[in-house]
């Protein structure tokens, strides 16, 4: 009897679309274990502003790959792929189906397609580039990048120091340009993937949900959560954790950049922009994907159950 490729489920969608609620219901019905695919939920101490599942929700459906990093730590798509593959293998070994839930599309892409063989960050090289920038300015380093990697220089704004640094770092470490290395792909995913995306059919409903959820976060103590982070000397707005939507706006409010009402307005706008980017990415997704309606959760659940049952029968 030939070995069958194991099944995994992707449940994607924009922020505030109801992914967590649906995942919890699926966990009660199907032999699945949940893996979070969210670049904000990885951070400890960032619970309210990330809409992290509550203790009650996690008791019903434990999520792997949440609370695995301190906000000061870096975590890449490559880190996620390595961690997710380990968790998926562990779930399959237990006779269950991995259910990957979240809205960080870059993580899904890395998982499906593998990653180009880019070197890990090297603090010594990065520091040398920073020192060079202090002497010459980032515009001069952008010109240097244009000679090494014209394609990357076209994509990267001359003021985007972080991306200029990374592109130069890659060249200094490997002798090859970022553009050249990015064209090389890694290993594909050894799973049969059922891919679903959930969102309301009417975009205005999602906008309303985002506004209501942000207001609820404020009521739940989001400001106090960010104040604890703000008081830490090792955290700043250049860190990925502090650039998460909502956190940046609250941080800037605490710094005195604008008043409370403006912070709420900017936080809601930033979250809506994130949702728009997520939907745009999903609309352009090159893999087969079935769309589910956020306002018809029972129907969405039955659609996924039917797909899993069908594939299980075909593999048996």
Swiss-Prot record:
Substrate binds at residues 15-20. ATP binds at residues 13-20. It catalyses: adenosine(37) in tRNA + dimethylallyl diphosphate = N(6)-dimethylallyladenosine(37) in tRNA + diphosphate. One of its GO terms (molecular function) is ATP binding. This is tRNA dimethylallyltransferase. Monomer. Catalyzes the transfer of a dimethylallyl group onto the adenine at position 37 in tRNAs that read codons beginning with uridine, leading to the formation of N6-(dimethylallyl)adenosine (i(6)A). Belongs to the IPP transferase family. It comes from Pasteurella multocida (strain Pm70). HAMAP family: IPP_trans (MF_00185). The record marks 104, 126 as: Interaction with substrate tRNA. Keywords: ATP-binding, Magnesium, Nucleotide-binding, Transferase, tRNA processing. InterPro entries: Dimethylallyltransferase, IPT, P-loop_NTPase. The keyword NADP does not apply. The lineage of its organism: Bacteria, Pseudomonadati, Pseudomonadota, Gammaproteobacteria, Pasteurellales. GO terms for biological process: tRNA modification. The gene is miaA. It is an enzyme of class 2 (transferase). Residues 38-41, 162-166, 243-248, 276-283 are annotated as: Interaction with substrate tRNA. The keyword Magnesium applies.
